[in-house]
Amino acid sequence: MEEDNLEIRKSNISGKGVFAKKLIKKGEKICFMEGEEVSVEEFIRRIKEGIEKDGDFLQVDNEKYIDMKESNRCINHSCNPNAFIRGKNELVALKDINKGEEIAYDYSTTMWEDKDEIKKELGTDAWTMKCKGGSKNCRKIIDQFYLLPKDLQKYYIKNKLAPDFILKKSAKN
């Protein structure tokens, strides 16, 4: 995390959040979502064994995840995001983010899992959660990209506001 530009503190969204310490301009890199890259099998093992929670991971390819470092885990979700993931794991400002403003991205733009495989292994759907953001356009549930409303999927795809693997999968479907 770019500690010079960001700070972690109590969030109005949920738990801790990441906040801008200076103005971050639209299109500017905020940070890389860093951690250990693991396979889907390792992702499942760590969750089953209670080593990690499913929200500790960022999906970066069909069967690859990053077990994010603690500071990246503090970046909250919003249905009205001011940031997005570009490429593989680069968090970028979607619009100008003012000093003191919390940074949040739409978690649904980073998930496209084989729910049947995950459910079989874990006994539950992976990574479906209630939204706590409270924005006017709140969807109430955070889930897979392909389950987003079609108009929102089209917006994210057209504007390339999702990781490369999501954009590639969307082009095939």
Enumerate the language-model features and the residues they cover:
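Conserved catalytic SET/PR domain of SAM-dependent protein methyltransferases, capturing the structural core
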Residues: M1-N173
